[in-house]
C-alpha cells in the first residue's frame, strides 16, 4: 500500500507563493532572463511541462525533468508533449495523484538523484507538488525550475537554508495528515542516500 502526504486545504495558499525567485514573463524570453545564472549547477531539475519545453527549446538540458503532459489541469499541446520526450532522456513513470506526494514519487526522485543519467520522470496524475521533495532531495548547488501559472518561472537555488525552509513546510504537511505511516516518508527524506 502506498503512503502519501495530502495537501490540506488550509495549506494550499502556501503553495501559491514562489519558493524562489520569480522571473516574470512567458516562453523562451523568460528562460533567457535567468539562463546566465545557470553556470554549471550540481543538478538542474525542471518541474512542469511548459517550463521543461521552453528550457529544451532554449538548448538548456535539465538533468531531471518531471512532467505529466498537462498544464493548468489540461492536456499540453502535441508540440510540448513531443519536445519533452527528447531522446536524450531515459524515461521513468510514477503514479502520483493530484494534491498528493506519494512515497513512490519520493523513492523515484531518490533514484534519479543517485543516477548520472538524464531522466524524464513522467507522472501519471500530477507533478505540481513534486517541487517540494525535489528541493529536499537535490544536492546543494542544484537549481530547480518550475512554472508559476500565468506569472513566469520560479528559480530555486538549493542551499541548506532552502532545504530547512522546505523541511519546515513538510513537517506542517505531515502533522496535518496525522498518519503514523508518514514516518516512512520522513525516513526516506532523511536518509535517502541509504535507499
From Swiss-Prot:
GO molecular function: GTP binding; kinase activity
Annotated positions binding GTP: 49-50, 68, 127, 150
EC identifiers of the protein: 2.7.1.237
Protein name per its UniProtKB record: GTP-dependent dephospho-CoA kinase
GO BP: coenzyme A biosynthetic process
Catalytic activity: 3'-dephospho-CoA + GTP = GDP + CoA + H(+)
Protein family (similarity comment): Belongs to the GTP-dependent DPCK family.
InterPro entries: GTP-dep_dephospho-CoA_kin (IPR007164)
Pathway field: Cofactor biosynthesis; coenzyme A biosynthesis
The protein's role, per its UniProt record: Catalyzes the GTP-dependent phosphorylation of the 3'-hydroxyl group of dephosphocoenzyme A to form coenzyme A (CoA).
Top-level taxon in the UniProt lineage: Archaea
Alphabetical UniProt keywords: Coenzyme A biosynthesis, GTP-binding, Kinase, Nucleotide-binding, Transferase
